[in-house]
Amino acid sequence: MNARAILRDGILGHNPGLVQLLGLCPLLAVSSTVANALGLGLATLGVLVVSNLLAALAGPRLPREVRLAVFVLLIAAAVTTVELTMAAWWPGLHASLGIFLPLIITNCLVLARAESFASRQSPASAVLDGFAMGTGFLLALLALGAVRELLGRGSLGADLDLLLGPAFAGAGWQLFPEASGLLIARLAPGAFVLLGLMLAAGNAIRARRRRVHGTSALVASGVEPGS
């Protein structure tokens, strides 16, 4: 695969959160605010890049019988590094993400990319795939986090100081009073419903594009649509 195809598949065509539905547990549980979504998304992106690189370097040299176990250990090392870094530099965000940060180790997205793609590709392609898949997952988290924060708290980016530092306290937008927000949007059931609506909208857009492309192909071939 060329670089453009890898990027397109990771971010759009095979978006891990909105198309493959991988990593639903953190996607639904942590995306209550833009800050939480951005923090976990960046952490997952970093783990994907590092674990894919390690899998590409070690995979061809590992016996098939122990490959999965070694990949889990490599992923655990990457997650531990990210978690300790976040605990040192962003303690507020680290506390807000809680158990879901170390649970990146069990995220099926990370292990699936290491086993099914990175271990069979060059290090450069593996790193690019990790970046593309991580970016796709980050965008899915941000989209859901923005909708949930807006509907549930009436704000956007209200807690970005957890990630960017005290200088950004109050840097978000409070669009309407928090008391007027929808409580269900802050909870996991609301996240599940909103994700379903986002998936339905995405499917409708893709279906419309297929119909338009199909009609264009028929017209180009000289066949009247509907004949």
Language model region names:
Residues 1-8, 162, 166-171, 206-227:
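Intrinsically disordered, low-complexity non-transmembrane regions of multi-pass membrane transporters
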Residues 24-28, 44-45, 49, 76-83, ...:
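Hydrophobic core segments of alpha-helical transmembrane domains in multi-pass membrane transport
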Residues 34-50, 70, 94-105:
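Structural signature of hydrophobic alpha-helical transmembrane segments
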Residues 51-64, 111-121:
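C-terminal ends of transmembrane helices
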Residues 62-75, 96-102, 126-129, 215-216:
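Cytoplasmic-side transmembrane-helix entry/capping segments in multi-pass membrane proteins
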Residues 81-97:
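Transmembrane alpha-helix boundary signature
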Residues 130-155:
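Hydrophobic alpha-helical membrane-insertion segments
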Residues 157-186:
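Short, membrane-exposed interhelical loops at transmembrane-helix boundaries
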